Amino acid sequence: MERDCMEFDVLIVGAGPAGLSAACRVKQLAMEKDQEISVCVVEKGSEVGAHILSGAVFETRSLDELFPDWEAMGAPLNTKVNQDKTYYLSNELNGHELPTWAVPNTLHNDGNYIISLGNLCRWMASQAENLGVEIYPGFSANRAIIDEQNRVCGVLTGDMGLDKNGEQKANYEPGIELRAKFTLFAEGARGHIGKQLINKFNLAEDKTPQHYAIGFKELWEIPAEQHQQGLVVHGLGWPLANEASGGSYLYHLEGNQVAVGLIVDLNYENPHLSPFDEFQRFKHHPMIEQYLQNGKRISYGARAIAKGGFHSLPTQQFAGGLLIGCDAGTLNSAKIKGTHTAMKSGMLAAEAVFEAVSNQSVIADYQSHFKQSWLYEELYQARNFSSGIHRFGSWLGGGLAMLEHNVLKGKAKWNVRCEHPDHQSLILAENSDEILYPKPDGVLSFDRLSSVYLSNIFHEEDQPCHLQLASQRIPIEQNLALYAEPAQRYCPAGVYEIVEGAEQAELQINAANCIHCKTCDIKDPSQNITWTPPEGGGGPNYPNM
């Protein structure tokens, strides 16, 4: 069966904030110059926003540039931040609010909004379509198409209708060739094609390894008397103080809803640590429980976050394409924000690509646009935030951040680099303390399976496993023997289980549970797991996240 082929001027992989901003900006520039430029966005989720997960406190700077009249246009920014608190939790019972002067200036949220990023992306998609962008949800980009001149010239979407053995079923449809003069990869953190392109074109040369965290989010409905619309709460300390770096958040949206979550850096050392269970017990702290008691959990999700910052940012341009947004790692960890930076990277990419298409150039000169932008300046000023915490721990690293941002106002002359990749950070299980987590009570804390249910997940059961092992032996002979197989604990969805086989223990992969967080691809100590996209349209369907 022959593959269909479609051709465009610009192809964008991923309908998140970076990809949609790029699509809108290309079409805006084409209209300004009275040119016809075709733009296509392909999205692996069942709809735009289905795979979008973020806190999210949103800085409007990029949106102000892209759509100055966004308020009149009905952008879903309904809750302005009106209170900003930071809690230090000293243990499971005690904590206190930090004074404003003790919090890095970058964490202040005056003028920002609490939003659903999924809903913002849905709104941006409608604006893109109004501008003439073609958007195709439910199609996963499987691999980049690279020609004989080593130029990226599009992507091949995944085949549909293969059974678990890779054989064609009655409904088989081959993937489609989507070809373009320029392809922008906006897959989010640890994008599977982006990862391949970084390696193929050596884009991370002289850069530090990218660093990641896993971010959890639950959406709750709470009683009106506990709701304080516009309140932003960030937390540090317990439960992560001694085992990992990271932090917590609780945001009061409209409609008596709160978003609560925990961010756990993936450079933690103890293989017995379970980020999911840390999140569940976090909600029992009295300073957090006060907001959630008598409430109802209505949604759950988790996603990897690329947080290495400026020192980890790869070269983003190559022949025929660009990496943008979290696919490259444009998040500003000093602000705990990545949406406005992802959007700006997409807009800069659009300007570079528009120039290249107009001039019939092979390479879009993104780097020049980037270095002349406020995005470059912002990421440069925040360059030592994540690496400082990774190198020196939460207290010394946090003190360095205070010095750089509150005293030196982002003008520090030194660089702090972290050369140690996250997957190499685990120590042996025999040298680690086991962690006994409390059983979930079904009121504030929950188990993995009931949580995954609230992600509205769907995968076709009879399809090839999208979680690929380079070696079937490593999970038992190395990971289980040395690290008590940490995949059982770092996965937030119960995908990986150790079961007793006929002769020895085996790793069972429950691929249908996967919520596409990419943590296994990042944290596996042997780098034995590769996350690949399942059939298009599969995965979580986040409604308001």
Give the residues covered by each predicted segment.
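FAD-binding beta-loop-beta segment adjacent to the flavin cofactor pocket
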Residues: 303-333, 451-462, 475-490, 497
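Glycine-rich FAD pyrophosphate-binding loop
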Residues: 27-52
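Beta1/beta-strand and adjacent pyrophosphate-binding region of the FAD-binding site
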Residues: 3-18, 40
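N-terminal FAD cofactor-binding segment of flavoenzymes
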Residues: 44-93
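C-terminal auxiliary extensions adjacent to catalytic cores
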Residues: 389-443
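Predominantly flavin-linked oxidoreductase catalytic cores and closely associated redox partners
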Residues: 118, 122, 127-290, 348, ...
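Active-site-proximal substrate-binding core of FAD-dependent oxidoreductases
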Residues: 329-335, 351-394, 508-510, 540
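Iron-sulfur cluster-binding cysteine motifs and their immediate structural context
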Residues: 481-511, 519-541
